[in-house]
């Protein structure tokens, strides 16, 4: 009965957060063979294995699945669905699981040759030095791992500066076997490197400069250095690039974090408390175990300043520093890359995913594209989340998964080894288009043929939940009705995320929340009769009033499928106190209608015929964003809150709407 393909849903066993335990589609499963010798695996949607099944005990009404590790699944049949719990070492792991049979199989996960040109082959034997110290200009010693090709060279150098304490043997062998010297360097305060981790911006910039120039002088190096790095490592690559070291020949970061007031730890100066997981992970010289942290329950309590202590992480200086700067002040401006990006002289390849929870690559592309005379820049935006476009399950089609290192290798073959492989003459933008599930090359970002289309919010005053009368249309509203709801910080509208994951997942199903939460207004279009492609930056403009001194306005864009399930496309937030600018705070006047402009990030998606476009408006998405306590005080340090009574206006004088970048088809 298990043979075939399954969707896998998870839910946490218990939580103090209302709605936080909602079922989430987290992965897929495939089984083959008779029950007596069945094989298969359960994988996350990113493609990572959760359980490789090696043993099955099948009874008439239940199944036990186990593998080589410590995980076991006990499940009972409910019709054609399996429902049960996960066990770790025979004990409940606090997570429930459902397997729902798919009607169509997943596509086999083979990397797609997005850039089909030739790349350097794996041909060299490899030697490793697991601990080499580099001395910075101020005398600090930074621990480095070096993998070298066996040969005389000269070789290009691939440098990865990292705050993560791991020896990158796999990466080292990949690059060195292909004719590159690979260097992974621990930043200050990590592993056995001197100093304090996450120090000031200037130190990271200087260390990046020094590391590039040191790497360029390594034996058998050709003097050309390229930098890679994922997530925070990508930030470090950008920090080095803005210092313009003479021997930095190219960078190719993936999912690089952006300016910190824009994303991580704040999003447009709204704090994201789920980053406590990362702060606890990084609180010491080595990566800390956070697998047992009950972050969901801890988040239910106030104030946020005490969150690391409630989790048993102790004092976390990085967390304290984040909390200490709640406005766009000189601290955050100093850490920004976009304002210094004209200093970057090296060619840039950026790789990320539409569901990455970092907007850095798009922000950097926009800023760098405005610099006259900058060397070549390429942007690759795929279907993945923060872990990368390498880890995408097959549900987006045969072209969905791309090998990041192969793109970086072709980039460095050109700029570090001088091979005329044509990568600098190709169209500079690659986007994966959801719906069509194809990659497409473009001449520029944003797309020149974009037509901004306004979709207006309207109702008869009862838009609460998806059963209400909220309408989304390209025709401006003619009526004068407004919609109201109450926002209670004790029961915030939830965002579907397991906070033990360090990222948002791919396309969350918000169907149940749209139907049940009366503190969210829902506006849905008519059935689409033709495809509508939306590729680019999205935004919203709301006219709204509150009786609170401060509050939040959140807009989410969703794709409603013919079967009724609603998948999140993107969302964005405006904190009322920052409506005049992120560097100043202005409390509200009770009942005054104000305009809020909200950044909805970006996507590339075809809303297909038979689908509907949906917009929801709420005042919380917790714990993605911290709860606004509605008092006008400090939302991170305070514990008292009030209920806010909200009014969204959508009349001819106040035409609340979203703007979608439509691509003619």
Annotate each predicted stretch with a short phrase.
Residues 177, 239-343:
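Accessory cap/linker subdomain of secreted extracellular hydrolases
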Residues 133, 404, 417-665:
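Glycine/threonine-rich phosphate-binding loop and adjacent beta-strand/alpha-helix elements that clamp
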Residues 117, 149-216, 391-396, 515-517, ...:
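Cap/lid segment of the alpha/beta-hydrolase catalytic domain
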Residues 344, 350-352:
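Short beta-strand/loop motif that positions the catalytic acidic residue
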Residues 229-239:
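Glycine-rich nucleophile elbow surrounding the catalytic serine of serine-hydrolase chemistry
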Residues 219-231:
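Alpha/beta-hydrolase fold nucleophile elbow
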Residues 108-151, 524, 528-530:
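N-terminal cap/lid segment of alpha/beta-hydrolase-fold proteins
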Residues 2-78, 85-86, 93:
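Central antiparallel beta-sheet cores of small beta-barrel/beta-sandwich binding domains
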């Amino acid at each position: 009965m298990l043979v075939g393909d399954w969707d896998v849903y998870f839910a946490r066993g218990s939580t103090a957060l209302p709605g936080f335990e909602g079922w989430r589609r987290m992965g897929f499963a495939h089984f083959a063979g008779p029950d007596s010798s069945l094989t298969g695996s359960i994988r996350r949607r990113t493609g990572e294995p959760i359980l490789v099944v090696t043993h099955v005990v099948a009874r008439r009404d239940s199944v036990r699945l186990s593998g080589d590790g410590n995980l076991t699944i006990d499940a009972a049949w409910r019709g054609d669905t399996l429902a049960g719990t996960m066990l770790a070492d025979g004990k409940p792991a606090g997570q429930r699981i459902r397997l729902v049979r798919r009607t169509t199989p997943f596509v086999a996960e083979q990397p797609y040759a997005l850039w089909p040109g030739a790349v350097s082959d794996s041909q060299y034997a490899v030697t490793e030095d697991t601990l080499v110290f580099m001395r910075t200009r101020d005398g600090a010693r930074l621990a480095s791992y070096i993998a070298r090709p066996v040969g005389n060279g000269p070789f290009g150098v691939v440098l990865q500066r990292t705050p993560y304490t791991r020896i990158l043997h796999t990466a080292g062998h990949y690059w060195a076997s292909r004719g590159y010297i690979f260097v992974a360097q621990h930043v200050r305060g990590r592993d056995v490197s001197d100093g304090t981790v996450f120090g000031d911006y200037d130190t990271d910039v200087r260390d990046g400069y020094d590391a590039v120039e040191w790497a360029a002088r390594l034996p058998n190096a050709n003097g050309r250095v390229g930098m890679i790095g994922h997530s925070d490592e990508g930030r470090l690559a950008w920090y080095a690039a803005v210092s313009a070291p003479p021997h930095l020949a190219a960078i190719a970061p993936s999912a690089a974090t952006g300016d910190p007031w824009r994303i991580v730890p704040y999003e447009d100066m709204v704090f994201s408390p789920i980053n406590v997981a990362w702060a606890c992970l990084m609180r010491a010289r080595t990566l800390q175990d956070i697998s047992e942290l009950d972050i969901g329950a801890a988040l239910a309590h106030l104030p946020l300043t005490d969150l690391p202590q409630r989790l048993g992480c102790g004092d976390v200086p990085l967390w304290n520093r984040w909390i200490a700067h709640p406005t766009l002040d000189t601290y955050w401006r100093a850490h920004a890359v976009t304002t210094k990006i004209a200093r970057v002289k090296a060619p840039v390849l950026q790789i990320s995913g539409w569901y990455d929870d970092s907007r850095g690559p798009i922000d950097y592309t926009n800023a760098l594209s405005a610099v006259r005379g900058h060397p070549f820049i390429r942007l690759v935006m795929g279907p993945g989340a923060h872990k990368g476009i390498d880890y995408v399950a097959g549900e987006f089609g045969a072209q969905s998964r791309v090998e990041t290192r192969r793109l970086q290798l072709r980039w460095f073959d050109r700029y570090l080894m001088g091979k005329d492989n044509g990568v600098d003459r190709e169209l500079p933008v690659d986007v994966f288009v959801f719906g069509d599930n194809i990659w497409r090359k473009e001449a520029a970002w944003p797309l020149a043929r974009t037509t901004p289309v306004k979709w207006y919010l309207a109702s008869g005053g009862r838009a609460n939940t998806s059963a209400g009368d909220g309408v989304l249309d390209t025709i401006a509203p003619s009526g004068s009705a407004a919609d109201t709801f109450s926002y209670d910080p004790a029961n915030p509208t939830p965002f579907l995320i397991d906070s033990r994951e360090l990222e948002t997942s791919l396309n969350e199903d918000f169907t149940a929340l749209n139907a049940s939460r009366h503190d969210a207004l829902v506006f849905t279009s008519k059935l689409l009769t033709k495809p509508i492609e939306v590729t680019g930056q999205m935004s919203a403009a709301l006219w709204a009033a509150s009786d609170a001194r401060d509050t939040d306005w959140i807009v989410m864009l969703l794709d409603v499928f013919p079967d009724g399930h609603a998948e999140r496309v993107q969302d964005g937030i405006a904190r009322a106190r920052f409506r005049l600018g992120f560097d100043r705070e202005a409390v509200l006047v009770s009942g005054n209608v104000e305009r809020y402009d909200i950044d909805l990030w970006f996507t590339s998606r075809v809303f297909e015929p038979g689908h509907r476009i949906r917009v929801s408006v709420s005042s919380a998405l917790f714990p993605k964003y911290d709860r606004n306590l509605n008092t006008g005080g400090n939302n991170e340090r305070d514990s008292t809150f009030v209920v806010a009574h909200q009014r969204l206006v959508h009349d001819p004088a106040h035409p609340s709407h979203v703007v979608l970048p439509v691509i003619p088809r």
